[in-house]
Regions:
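Replace the tail clause
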Residues: 1, 6-10, 14-298, 302-306, ...
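Long, K/E/R/D-enriched contiguous segments that form extended
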Residues: 301-304, 309-311, 321-356, 362, ...
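Phosphate/diphosphate-binding loops
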Residues: 370
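A short, hydrophobic C-terminal helix/tail in secreted or cell-surface proteins
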Residues: 379-386
């Protein structure tokens, strides 16, 4: 969002004496973010960033929302007016607010405790794939309308052998989506994919490039047999996101300095021949454990399948770095590190699972089972208590 909006939003909270503002780093604490995102779903269907959650002193959510502008703009109230209304509700109708918070918390607890009796069978998975494919944009490829995201998990599901056998039309929709994305402005000349396109035809991207998206899209391209796209993504991971000290950075910024001014996408809009004289967008150097697990697995599999041992070697180097650096003083995995300094946030269950999956793929590519040694993971030391 625009910097002016962020500034005014921060000023509104700072000037109010009725709230205690706590800012959550989503990359450091995805578990906290996920919990409050789930709670916010009780109040709005438009989930995303920025997320503002109003809680009781016990941390239970009684109201939430995403974007509120600095000044009222139909149908959205001004953020300052939202603060005033929430404060009035808490002051004059506190019992109802607390009851609402308890109801949301209880509903989420029940949903989290529900365990399906059986895993979905082949028919259920094929049915899900067909339901996704029914939303295909037949004109421009992909699914749904603007904004359009290259949802690698969706494409990966549609590419599974089961779906290709049971719902071949759905698998074909995934192949068409990848082809459309690869030929569009969503993919940069150096091979990496941007975060999303603001238009239905995959134009006008948001120019940030994420490690998670590109690592997963590498596997999508690999499974689709699109060697050119796969090679481009791998080259982007190794050439741009890899950190000199080791591991892969979290993302490359969307903005860069062009002619003395910060420009959204300005670097990427220049011809490749002109980029050599420009400073490229900065890379977020945080080496996130789970995200690196995705990259390790993707590069190991791609390198093995396409005959690129250097990619496998890069995966080995990243694995060694994460297993050595992303640890606390008790030798437990942490969420991330920056410039060789480990974060204080303990690795989540997802971090452990993604890293383990990446190490299994690395072991398969190298033939070295030491990659998946249990002593490397120390999963029982993590917050997940696996």
């Amino acid at each position: 969002l625009h910097k002016e909006y962020r500034r005014q939003r921060q000023m509104c909270i700072r000037d109010s004496r009725d709230f205690v503002a706590i800012k959550v780093d989503r990359e450091e604490h995805p578990d906290v973010d996920g919990a409050y995102m789930a709670a916010a779903s009780a109040f709005t269907q438009n989930l995303g960033w920025p997320l503002t959650v109003f809680t009781t002193p016990r941390g239970r959510t009684f109201y939430a929302g995403t974007y509120w502008p600095p000044e009222a703009r139909q149908p959205l109230p001004a953020f300052r007016d939202v603060l005033a209304a929430v404060n009035e509700a808490w002051t004059l109708r506190r019992v109802q607010a607390e009851e609402s918070a308890d109801a949301v918390t209880d509903a989420l607890a029940r949903a989290g405790a529900a365990v399906p009796s059986d895993l979905p069978d082949a028919a259920a998975l094929a049915g899900a794939a067909e339901a996704i494919a029914a939303r295909e944009d037949r004109q421009f490829g992909g699914f749904g309308g603007a904004p359009k995201f290259p949802v690698a998990t969706t494409l990966g599901l549609l590419q599974t052998p089961l779906v290709r056998r049971k719902a071949p039309d759905a698998a074909a929709a995934a192949d068409r989506a990848l082809a459309a994305m690869s030929a569009s402005a969503l993919r940069d000349a150096d091979g990496g994919f941007f975060r999303y396109a603001t238009q239905r035809d995959w134009t006008v991207p948001h120019y940030e490039r994420m490690l998670t998206d590109n690592a997963q899209l590498l596997l999508v391209a690999l499974d689709a047999g699109d060697e050119s796209t796969a090679r481009g993504i791998a080259d982007f991971l190794v050439g741009t996101l890899r950190r000199d000290g080791g591991g892969f950075g979290a993302a490359q910024d969307s903005e860069s300095w062009i002619d003395g001014q910060r420009s959204e996408g300005g670097y990427y809009l220049r011809p490749v021949t002109e980029r050599a004289g420009l400073e490229p967008p900065a890379v977020d150097g945080k080496v996130i454990t789970g995200w690196n697990g995705l990259a390790i697995g993707a590069l190991a599999r791609a390198g093995s399948r396409l005959g690129e041992p250097t990619w496998v070697a890069e995966a080995e180097d990243a694995a060694a770095y994460v297993l050595q650096v992303n640890r606390d003083t008790a030798d437990a995995l942490v969420r991330a590190s920056l410039d060789g300094v480990a974060s204080q946030a303990i690795a989540t269950a997802a971090d452990v699972a993604l890293l383990a999956d990446g190490l299994f793929s690395l072991a398969a590519a190298t033939g070295d089972p030491r990659s998946v040694s249990y002593t490397h993971l120390r999963a029982h030391e993590t917050e997940a208590d696996l």
